[in-house]
């Protein structure tokens, strides 16, 4: 099972993103490989909703309804599992925040990584590998790089 970072969802749907083409190519590859199962940390959807509907960031920002339709689409896919934190992942998040001296801007990514690890997810699709490298727990699939 492969975890998805929020940036992948945003780049997949934001057509003007410089990473859109690579995100779409990777998505097509995933869709065509029935053996690939995906995991999405629940808060990725909250972040997606927050970012993709922001008219200050996007000239053609999604409406709330459009963003929710995208989220519903992902939640309904058979090969996608939405993950939620548990006590272990929450405590690991706090431990990692202390251990790696991470600041407040790293809370969401740290909690996502911890939840993925608790669910035996060892690979993450991201355009921000530096957010996860510090944990030494994941194979990072950086879709910015053409393969």
Regions found by a protein language model. Name each.
Residues 40-46:
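Aromatic- and histidine-enriched alpha-helix N-cap/loop-to-helix transition segments
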Residues 80-123, 127:
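Active-site neighborhoods of divalent-metal-dependent phosphate/nucleic-acid chemistry enzymes
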Residues 8, 44, 89, 111-112, ...:
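Alpha-helix capping/helix-boundary segments
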Residues 36, 80, 138:
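Short, conserved active-site loop motifs that form the nucleotide-linked donor/cofactor pocket
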Residues 1-40, 55-69, 147:
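Short, well-structured N-terminal submotif of metal-dependent ribonuclease cores
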Residues 1, 110-147:
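Acidic, PIN/NYN-like endoribonuclease modules and their adjacent C-terminal/linker elements
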Residues 29-33, 74, 96, 100:
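Hydrophobic helix-cap positions at the C-terminus of alpha-helices
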């Amino acid at each position: 099972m492969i975890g998805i970072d929020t940036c992948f969802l945003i780049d997949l749907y934001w057509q003007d993103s410089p990473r859109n083409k690579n995100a779409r190519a990777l998505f097509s590859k995933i869709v065509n490989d029935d053996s690939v199962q995906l995991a999405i940390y629940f808060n990725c959807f909250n972040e997606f909703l927050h970012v993709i509907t922001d008219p200050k960031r996007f000239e053609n920002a999604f409406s709330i309804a459009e963003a929710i339709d995208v989220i519903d689409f992902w939640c309904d896919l058979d090969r996608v599992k939405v993950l939620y934190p548990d006590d272990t992942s929450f405590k690991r998040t706090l431990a990692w925040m202390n251990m790696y001296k991470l600041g407040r801007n790293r809370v969401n990514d740290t909690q996502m990584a911890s939840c993925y690890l608790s669910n035996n997810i060892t690979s993450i699709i991201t355009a921000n590998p530096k957010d996860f490298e510090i944990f030494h727990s994941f194979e990072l699939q950086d879709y910015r790089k053409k393969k």
